């Protein structure tokens, strides 16, 4: 029996559910297991634990922002193929969200207290990008993923040598972020102008500075 198309109410409720899962810790079902080679939790000093927790909180916030961005773009995208691509990428990024939440819990820490704000701002940006054009929307994704990859690689370099667990998680995330970037470009993503790229980087830096502590 064929499934009936989703009504506007169904779509609204589904969107609300996705938003809540993005901002409420541990609300997503188990997805792929942690991409780690050992179940052993590395021993870190108090200072090291706090620093790694700050880095993972930034990365968790980045994944919350990715959820908001993809959901916003899917909400306003004009092309059905673009909508499906945004939704698929968002679903894959849920794994990253869960991995960061898990590592934060292992470190005895928590996500950013501003998580709902990060999501809301990103949803708005994504919705605007999706409304402008498909090429701009996909270009926005490509640039976002490129900048996310940069800070993931920077964080990997800042990890204590013995924290192989966090390193493997971030390395897997980085590989998949770059894949999402290539996918966006392959589907027609346009290069963004330098002022837009610089503004995105400035906003990301403000987010990282805040999320590291809060």
Swiss-Prot record:
GO molecular function: 3-demethoxyubiquinol 3-hydroxylase activity; metal ion binding
UniProt keywords, alphabetically: Cell membrane, Iron, Membrane, Metal-binding, Monooxygenase, Oxidoreductase, Ubiquinone biosynthesis
Keyword field contains Membrane: yes
Binding residues annotated for Fe cation 2, in chain numbering: 93, 145, 177, 180
Coiled coil: none
EC number: 1.14.99.60
Residue ranges of the TM segments: none
Cofactor: Fe cation
Keyword Cell membrane: yes
First-listed, main subcellular location of the protein, grouped into a coarse class: membrane
GO process annotations (BP): ubiquinone biosynthetic process
Residues bound to Fe cation 1: 63, 93, 96, 177
Subcellular location(s) of the protein: Cell membrane
Enzyme class at the top of the EC tree: oxidoreductase
CC annotations in GO: plasma membrane
Membrane topology: Peripheral membrane protein
HAMAP family: COQ7
Function noted in UniProt: Catalyzes the hydroxylation of 2-nonaprenyl-3-methyl-6-methoxy-1,4-benzoquinol during ubiquinone biosynthesis.
Name of the protein in question: 3-demethoxyubiquinol 3-hydroxylase
């Amino acid at each position: 029996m064929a499934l009936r198309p989703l009504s506007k109410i169904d779509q609204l409720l589904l969107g609300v559910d996705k938003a809540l899962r993005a901002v409420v810790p541990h609300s997503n079902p188990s997805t792929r297991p942690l991409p780690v080679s050992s179940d052993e939790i590395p021993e870190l000093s108090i200072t090291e634990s706090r620093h790694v927790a700050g880095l993972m909180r930034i990365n968790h916030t980045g994944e919350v922002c990715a959820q908001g961005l993809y959901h916003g773009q899917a909400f306003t995208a004009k092309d059905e193929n673009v909508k499906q691509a945004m939704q698929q990428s968002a679903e894959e990024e849920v794994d990253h969200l869960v991995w960061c939440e898990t590592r934060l819990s292992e470190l005895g820490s928590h996500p950013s207290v501003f998580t709902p704000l990060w999501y809301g701002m990103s949803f708005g940006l994504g919705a605007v990008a999706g409304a402008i054009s498909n090429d701009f929307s996909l270009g926005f994704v490509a640039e976002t993923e490129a900048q996310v990859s940069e800070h993931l690689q920077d964080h990997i370099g800042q990890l204590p040598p013995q924290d192989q667990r966090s390193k493997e998680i971030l390395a897997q995330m980085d590989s998949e972020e770059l894949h999402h970037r290539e996918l966006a470009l392959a589907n027609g993503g346009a290069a963004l102008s330098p002022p837009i790229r610089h503004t995105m980087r400035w906003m990301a830096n403000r987010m990282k500075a805040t999320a590291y502590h809060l």
